[in-house]
């Protein structure tokens, strides 16, 4: 319940204040969001399978975001940032859809 309230407050604050993302951070934002979504869907799946551990969830959430950002940063330094960003999005997208399929099977039996 606290998480839902925090989400609503965050959305409202974002709509009211219209924050701008610094140009330096923009390449990493989309990767961070997708990495965070991967952790959230993994957490939902674990919750439905009754193996959810909040410590594992928080560590997974932070670690996914940091590793994805680090990979993009290294790619930018090597001049292949766009290709690595695409690779990260594809890999995390596959994981998200895998978790979504498991959630669908668990919730709807299909």
Residue map of PLM features:
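Structural signature of hydrophobic alpha-helical transmembrane segments
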Residues: 24-37, 85
């Amino acid at each position: 319940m606290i998480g839902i309230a925090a989400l609503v407050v965050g959305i409202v604050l974002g709509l009211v204040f219209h924050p701008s993302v610094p140009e330096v951070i923009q390449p990493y934002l989309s990767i961070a969001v997708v990495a965070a979504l991967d952790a959230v869907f993994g957490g939902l799946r674990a919750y439905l399978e009754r193996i959810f551990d909040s410590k594992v969830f928080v560590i997974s959430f932070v670690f996914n975001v940091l590793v994805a950002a680090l990979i993009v940063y290294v790619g930018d330094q090597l001049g292949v940032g766009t290709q690595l960003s695409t690779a990260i999005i594809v890999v995390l997208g596959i994981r998200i859809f895998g978790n979504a399929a498991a959630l669908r099977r668990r919730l709807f039996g299909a």
